[in-house]
Curated annotation (Swiss-Prot):
Keywords annotated in UniProt: Amino-acid biosynthesis, ATP-binding, Cytoplasm, Glycosyltransferase, Histidine biosynthesis, Nucleotide-binding, Transferase
Catalytic activity: 1-(5-phospho-beta-D-ribosyl)-ATP + diphosphate = 5-phospho-alpha-D-ribose 1-diphosphate + ATP
Subunit composition and interactions: Heteromultimer composed of HisG and HisZ subunits.
Highest classification ranks of the organism: Bacteria, Pseudomonadati, Campylobacterota, Epsilonproteobacteria, Campylobacterales
Keyword Nucleotide-binding: yes
Reported function: Catalyzes the condensation of ATP and 5-phosphoribose 1-diphosphate to form N'-(5'-phosphoribosyl)-ATP (PR-ATP). Has a crucial role in the pathway because the rate of histidine biosynthesis seems to be controlled primarily by regulation of HisG enzymatic activity.
UniProt protein name: ATP phosphoribosyltransferase
NCBIfam families: hisG
SUPFAM superfamilies: Periplasmic binding protein-like II
Length: 203
């Protein structure tokens, strides 16, 4: 049996839809249940940010998670396949009236993704003070907490509604299929079989 960690929300639904196509059967969580066993799979409904931990620690053999989360957590997992679901971008946002001035002695950047942010500005040799927030990132430049933000952008509507614009794109992200390294050895045939079936559906 393969244990599969899925993120709550739209990505889980779209991933289960892929399984439904592969096995010609309905894969669906019952209301409020966090686990589902079906056709030699156990599915776990997990917070997106926790999936790399579940897979790294072996609580799940494989998982589906955004590339941005993988890069932020820098987890020791195998990246098997880009599922091309949940496409988005990690962007730098600033006020409409501002420009991003890389020559400032230190830029203050508010974000939920401190590691991606730190690595990006270090690669540009720009001094940045990272301000870790857990929500309402768009407020930070408006109230003077930061010069800019780093956040996930899907359509850009939230930024526009809050008087912000995209100043730069750090990376593009989409959901990836990942595997625990030990599981890939002990359950190699099962994982590769599933990999090929998923690949044939999405490509």
């Amino acid at each position: 049996m393969l244990t599969v960690a899925l993120p709550k929300g739209r990505i889980a639904d779209e991933t289960l839809n892929i399984f439904s196509k592969i096995f010609n059967d309905e894969f669906k969580f019952e209301d409020r249940k966090l686990t589902m066993i079906k056709d030699n799979f156990e599915f776990l409904m997990v917070r997106n940010q926790d999936i790399p931990t579940y897979v790294t620690e072996g609580a799940a053999d494989i998982g589906v998670v955004g590339l941005d989360v993988l890069e932020e957590h820098n987890c020791d997992v195998l990246r098997l396949l880009n599922l091309k679901l949940g496409k988005c971008k990690v962007c730098i946002g600033i006020k409409n009236s501002d420009t991003l001035d890389y020559t400032k002695p230190e830029l203050k950047i508010a974000t939920k993704m401190p590691n991606i942010t730190k690595n990006y500005f270090a690669s540009k040799a720009v001094a940045a003070k990272i301000i870790k927030l857990y929500g309402s990132i768009e407020l930070a430049p408006i109230v003077g907490l930061s010069d800019a933000i780093v956040d996930i952008v899907e359509t850009g509507t939230t930024m526009k509604q809050n008087g912000l614009k995209v100043a730069d794109i750090i990376m593009e992200s989409s959901a990836h299929l990942i595997a625990n390294k030990n599981s890939f050895i002990t359950k190699r045939d099962e994982i590769l079989s599933l990999y090929h079936k998923i690949n044939s559906v999405i490509n």
